[in-house]
Design a protein with these regions (language model features):
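Class I SAM-dependent methyltransferase SAM-binding "motif I" and its flanking Rossmann-like core
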Residues: 132-161
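Short acidic/polar capping segments at secondary-structure boundaries
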Residues: 28-29, 52, 71, 116-117, ...
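Acidic/Gly/His-enriched mid-domain segments of enzyme catalytic cores or analogous surface patches
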Residues: 41, 50-136
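Short beta-strand segments
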Residues: 23-25, 49, 113-115, 144-145, ...
Length: 221
């Protein structure tokens, strides 16, 4: 059983052991060492539908495969029937079905990998779902890509950074945003592009907003 508490919005590290569960979606399979390390150390490794086949093909052993099962071969479904959880309702996508599967088992700190790449509409939808998971499902979520991490946030958020780290802020509902530790002072951006390509000055960035926003922090090259 995973941990029960809802963690505070202060992301001190991307330590591979920091998560209750890792959800693998059907986008580009990770190649960067950060998401790969998180997957290797996952306490619960949950695949979204066809991502289960990809995981098994690459030698991983998923805890569960969740979705409507419309993208898996009949042979694979038969061979892995004991870990497949079919959810047929169409109100939510497979990423959300997998998230609910994890939260119903007490998981709150969830890392998402393979959620970007391939179809751009899926990428945008998956990133935006981070805010929904944070607000409605009380998940402390991070979405790890091969280039950086997306962090859903609200109110005050502290992030450990390094000097020169590229930081982008996507305002969702704030009428006020300010912060410390960035080269350019953030504000309540009215368009998504306005908050991109900021830069951390040192070892931490603190953001304060009166609503919800998503932060992107690039990895160190």
């Amino acid at each position: 059983m995973c941990n029960q508490p809802h963690f505070s919005k202060s992301f001190a590290s991307l330590h591979p052991d920091a998560f209750d569960a890792v959800i693998v979606a059907g986008g580009d399979f990770p190649t960067h060492h950060v998401p790969l390390a998180v997957m290797e150390r996952a306490r619960m490794l949950v695949a979204c539908d066809s991502a289960g086949e990809e995981l098994v093909r690459r030698g991983y052993k998923p805890t569960a495969i969740v979705g409507d099962c419309d993208s898996m071969s009949a042979e694979f479904r038969a061979a892995h029937a004991d870990i497949i959880y079919k959810v047929e309702e169409q109100d939510y996508n497979d990423l959300t079905k997998a998230t609910r599967f994890c939260t119903e088992r007490g998981c709150r700190r969830i890392a998402y990998v393979g959620a970007t790449g391939k179809r751009e509409d899926h990428t945008l939808g998956n990133i935006s779902l981070l805010d929904f998971y944070s607000r409605e499902l009380y998940v402390d979520a991070l979405m790890l890509t091969d280039y950086g991490v997306f962090i859903p946030a609200a109110g005050e958020t502290a992030i450990r950074t390094f000097a020169g780290q590229q930081i982008s802020i996507f305002n969702l509902s704030c009428t006020r945003i300010d912060g410390d530790g960035l080269r350019w002072q953030p504000y309540a951006f009215s368009a998504l592009w306005q908050g991109t390509l900021n830069e951390a000055l040192g070892e931490s960035v603190t953001l304060r907003g009166d609503g919800n926003y998503i932060v992107y922090a690039a990895y160190k090259l």
